[in-house]
């Protein structure tokens, strides 16, 4: 029998989001062996079960209340949402937060040797895609009629195979499109991974665990976006040094033994510290500049 006291989280078993989802759970302190082929993996230190499934199954598992949480790409979530609404359903769920990985874009692509004069170029054309509802919504808003060719894989080969005139598919670098004689012409949807929760009443113990998990996820994301910076800075130019780090909190200032002209500065910065910024800091007289990653962070 299913233990309803344990929090059930669905994540992609393998694919684009799998490794990042696994890393996120690990950095949140959830001890779990996700390197087996088992469908359900149980955490060692928390009442959490991880269901490892296909990514396009995750929205349905959450919307149908089979699992409590799901880590899923917004593109897959939105496609399932539109699909269910088209069937007259009223799917319910909560988006708890957007995550900092899984970024991609859903784009239209056409053969390189064909002219492109905007979306109207697709009027009456046949378009291959794995996202028919997202494609339809976009082109309907443009008032463009088209024929959809549903493919669940290798969408980029459709024009060469004579199956379609254009495609609508996920793009990261564009290298796959180029290798198949295609070019990206229009972005119709931008996506990242997100954490979603089922609708309906949640047991108090589960909700407390979800709140704890959200706090840890926030800490992990903040840590990844932040750096711990240490340097020696001239006392007369402290304000200028701090101004170069607009994302920083007020720094900790420490005296340097035997040096009245400089101080040691320690700070957490939420800004990416580029080489150019470090060079500007050095030009202001800063020295011994160290930029360190942060493992965990909680405000």
From Swiss-Prot:
- Which Pfam family is an annotated match for this chain, by its short name? HisG
Keyword field: Amino-acid biosynthesis, ATP-binding, Cytoplasm, Glycosyltransferase, Histidine biosynthesis, Magnesium, Metal-binding, Nucleotide-binding, Transferase
The protein's matches in PROSITE patterns, at most eight in alphabetical order, are given as: ATP_P_PHORIBOSYLTR
Q: Which is one Gene Ontology cellular component term of this protein? A: cytoplasm
**Catalysed reaction, written as an equation:** 1-(5-phospho-beta-D-ribosyl)-ATP + diphosphate = 5-phospho-alpha-D-ribose 1-diphosphate + ATP
BP GO terms, sorted: L-histidine biosynthetic process
How its function is modulated: the record gives:
Feedback inhibited by histidine.
The similarity annotation says: Belongs to the ATP phosphoribosyltransferase family. Long subfamily.
Name of this protein: ATP phosphoribosyltransferase
Protein's gene? hisG
């Amino acid at each position: 029998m299913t233990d309803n006291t344990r929090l059930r989280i669905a994540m992609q078993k393998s694919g684009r989001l799998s490794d990042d989802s696994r890393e996120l759970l690990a950095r949140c302190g959830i001890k779990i062996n996700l390197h087996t082929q088992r469908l359900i993996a149980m955490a060692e230190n928390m009442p959490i079960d991880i269901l490892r499934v296909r990514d396009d199954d995750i929205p349905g598992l959450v919307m149908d209340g089979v699992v409590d949480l799901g880590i899923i790409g917004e593109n897959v979530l939105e496609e399932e949402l539109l699909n269910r609404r088209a069937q007259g359903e009223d799917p319910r769920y909560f988006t708890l937060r957007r995550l900092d990985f899984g970024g991609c874009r859903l784009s239209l692509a056409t053969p390189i040797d064909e002219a492109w004069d905007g979306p109207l170029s697709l009027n009456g054309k046949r378009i291959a895609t794995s996202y028919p509802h997202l494609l339809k919504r976009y082109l309907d808003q443009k008032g463009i009629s088209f024929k959809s060719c549903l493919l669940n894989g290798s969408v980029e080969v459709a024009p060469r195979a004579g199956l379609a005139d254009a495609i609508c598919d996920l793009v990261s670098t564009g290298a796959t499109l180029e290798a198949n004689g295609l070019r990206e012409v229009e972005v119709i949807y931008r996506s990242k991974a997100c954490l979603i929760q089922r609708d309906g009443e949640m047991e108090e113990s589960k909700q407390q665990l979800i709140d704890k998990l959200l706090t840890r996820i926030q800490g992990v994301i903040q840590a990844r976006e932040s750096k711990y910076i240490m340097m020696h800075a001239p006392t007369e130019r402290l304000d200028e040094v701090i101004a170069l780090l607009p994302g920083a909190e007020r720094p900790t200032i420490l005296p340097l033994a035997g040096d009245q002209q400089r101080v040691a500065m320690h700070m957490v910065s939420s800004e990416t510290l580029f080489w150019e910024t470090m060079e500007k800091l050095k030009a202001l007289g800063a020295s011994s500049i160290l930029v360190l990653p942060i493992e965990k962070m909680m405000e």
